[in-house]
Amino acid sequence: MSAIQGIQGVISQLQATAMSARAQEPMPQPTISFAGQLHAALDRISDTQNTARVQAEKFTLGEPGVALNDVMTDMQKASVSMQMGIQVRNKLVAAYQEVMSMQV
C-alpha cells in the first residue's frame, strides 16, 4: 500500500511540475535574418582563411611553437570552408534563377 502511495506522490509532483511549466510564458526568440546568417557565415570563412594565412606566415618565419601539422590542418580547414562557401553560393544562384524563371 505504501508503494502505491509513493508512486501517487511522485505522479502528483510530476503533474505539478508540468502545470507550472505550462504557466510560464515562452521566451521570445530573437529574430534571425537570412542575410544576417549569410553574412556571419562569410565572416567565419574569412576568419578561417586569415587564421590559416597567419599560421603559415609564422611557420615560414620559424617561430617556435608552430608545428607543420597545425599549419596543414588550418590550411585544410580554410580550403574546406571556402569550398563549402562556393557550393552554397552556387546553390543560391541556382535557386534564384529557378525562382526568376517561374511564371506567375
Swiss-Prot record:
**Do you know which PANTHER family this protein is assigned to?**
FLAGELLAR HOOK-BASAL BODY COMPLEX PROTEIN FLIE (PTHR34653:SF1), PTHR34653
* Annotated protein name in UniProt: Flagellar hook-basal body complex protein FliE
> A cellular component term (GO) from this record?
bacterial-type flagellum basal body
Highest classification ranks of the organism: Bacteria, Pseudomonadati, Pseudomonadota, Gammaproteobacteria, Enterobacterales
Q: Which domain of life is it from?
A: Bacteria
The gene for this chain is fliE
User: A GO molecular-function term, please?
Assistant: structural molecule activity
Q: Name one Pfam family in it.
A: FliE
**Keywords from the UniProt entry:** Bacterial flagellum
A GO biological-process term: bacterial-type flagellum-dependent cell motility
Q: Where in the cell is it found?
A: Bacterial flagellum basal body
Q: Would the keyword Disulfide bond turn up in this protein's UniProt record?
A: no
Query: Per the record's keyword annotation, is Metal-binding included, yes or no?
Result: no
User: What NCBIfam families does the record tag this protein with?
Assistant: fliE
Q: Which InterPro entries match?
A: FliE (IPR001624)
Q: Which family does it belong to?
A: Belongs to the FliE family.
